[in-house]
């Protein structure tokens, strides 16, 4: 799943996604279920390097947040199927307010792809039972980690120090 997901996303597409993340005033990240865990993990990483990112899994709060977004903001929607009604409602509202949408979704054509400014694709060989979404979630996590590493590499002056400082603050809690 991970090799296939890397193969289907060109370096150019990945760098365009990095630019969307880096240039956004605010990044709202959402996903449902296992995709929501990937969203939360990625938002924490982005915050560590100074990117204003929020993960929102509560769909009522998500819709309230999205309607107040602007063209300077980015909605990152993570959904393997790309067909979750809640995620597509948020994407539709983001479009209405002029917000850009980055989707991390499956390669099979879906509703989320049609609304997104840009897509990164995950390839997963899920069984009918979706094997607890292990394959798709692993591919999503790999892509978000790749985006994070690229963002760090593009900001070597500040990002590593911010990560170290964040870790030092957390260590003070224990």
Model-derived regions, located:
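Helix-enriched interaction subdomains in cytosolic or periplasmic regions
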Residues: 1-3
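A short, well-structured juxtamembrane/interface segment
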Residues: 6-23
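Glycine-rich phosphate-binding loops that contact phosphosugars or nucleotide phosphates
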Residues: 23-142, 146-155
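A short, charged, Gly/Pro-tolerant segment at domain boundaries
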Residues: 157-174
């Amino acid at each position: 799943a991970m090799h296939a997901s890397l193969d289907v996303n060109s370096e150019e597409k990945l760098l365009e996604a990095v630019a969307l993340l880096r240039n956004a005033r605010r990044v709202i990240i959402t996903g449902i279920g296992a995709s929501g865990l990937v969203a939360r993990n990625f938002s924490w990483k982005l915050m560590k390097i100074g990117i204003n990112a929020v993960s929102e899994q509560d769909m009522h709060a998500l819709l309230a947040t999205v309607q107040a977004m602007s063209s300077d903001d980015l909605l990152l929607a993570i959904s393997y199927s790309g067909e979750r009604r809640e995620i597509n409602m948020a994407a539709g509202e983001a479009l209405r307010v002029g917000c850009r949408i980055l989707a991390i979704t499956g390669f099979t054509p879906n509703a989320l792809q049609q609304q997104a400014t840009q897509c990164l694709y995950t390839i997963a060989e899920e069984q009918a039972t979706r094997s607890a979404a292990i394959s798709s979630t692993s591919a999503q996590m790999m892509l978000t980690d790749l985006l994070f590493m690229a963002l760090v590499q593009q900001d070597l002056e500040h990002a590593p120090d911010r990560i170290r400082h964040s870790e030092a603050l957390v260590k003070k809690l224990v």
